Amino acid sequence: MRNKNLLEFCLSPDLGGLELFVANCFNDFRTKGSCKIAVAPDKKLDNYLEGKDKFYIKRNKFFPIIPALKLARFIDKSDIDVVHFHWTKDIGTVVLAKVLSKKKPKIIQTRNMTMTRFKDDFYHKWLYKNIDTIHAVTYQVKEQLERFIPKDVCPKVEVVYMGTKELDIKQQKVQSLKDKYNLTDEFIVGIVGRIEEGKGQWIVIEAISMLKELNIKVVIVGHTMDENYLESLKQKVKDLGVEDKIIFTGFTKEVDAHMKLFDVNILATPKETFGLVVIEAMVNKVCMIATNSGGPLEIIEDGVDGLLFDRSSEDLAEKIKLLYANKTLKESLALSGYEKAKEKFEASKQNEKLLNILKGM
């Protein structure tokens, strides 16, 4: 199988699981062959990839032909064989660039979002006709793609779960974070993700307000997407009288080190497509509690390697209380989760599967 020139493409302004997966693909693939990356300048992903050789394209939602022309020229100049894009809003730019280029590269999309409606209009049929492969991050996403995209234009759909890797976090680093947040012997409940309503931080705050008598603190990790929502969270903390139990860390690149603080990690999103944070917690030997829908259903076996809840604060409070009272159960679930993450979601194995798909196009 000959080496191919790959291009990772993402103009998203954010830095969440999707964008971190872009960075992980680029950092891994470039060690195994020719791989370049195109990002939007001065956005969070650009800053996260500090010191890397990046190609810059500004998104233009009113005149998409402008970034598409720039991308087409880059494709031809760099002899790109495969364009791998991730953000759904990039689909028009990438497809138009393929049409405008002389090289006519293969296109693969990593689909990180659910699909909920039929794509049978002329525009979407044209888009999908020009995409060669879609990488679905779960079997649920694969089923949705094959249901909603007309069969005569539906690209080949391949399922490869996302992966994560175990980092060597020194105890000294963990202790420094404990000191920073004034943590001692508390039971730590963590939630990692962008500060926006859909991530469900408010559910965790409400759940903890029902457990005031317990020695619990909550560490909320993530950068703010919605300032009004952040202020509403802080007001809820005051109204529920749990100011002494809630810590907002803000954005950090040291997510794994922060997870080492946790006894339990929560995913409270209503319809998480995959849940990268779930496997990140598992590989850090942190017990997971996640909503019983979407991607977590393909990751967690309830009561075996984690717990699922119905996204009510009452049910979450019960699950947290159960693990607080039963250290043996908590540690057993965490260990089983760790073993599953190493076996089924190890980054190098998952990246290799995806890379082989790209090379085979």
Where are the regions that the model predicts?
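Aromatic "clamp/platform" in nucleotide-sugar-dependent glycosyltransferases that forms part
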Residues: 251, 270
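A short, active-site helix/loop in glycosyltransferases that binds the activated sugar's phosphate group
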Residues: 131-156, 164-166
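A conserved, positively charged/aromatic
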Residues: 30, 105-136
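A conserved mid-protein helix/loop that constitutes part of the nucleotide-sugar donor-binding site
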Residues: 16-24, 187, 191-210, 214, ...
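Short hydrophobic beta-strand element within catalytic cores of glycosyltransferases
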Residues: 38-39, 287-290
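N-terminal strand-loop element at the rim of the active site
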Residues: 8-66, 146, 155-156
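Glycosyltransferase donor-sugar binding loop
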Residues: 38-43, 192, 217-231
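Conserved acidic donor-binding segment of nucleotide-sugar-dependent glycosyltransferases
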Residues: 302-303, 307-314, 322-327
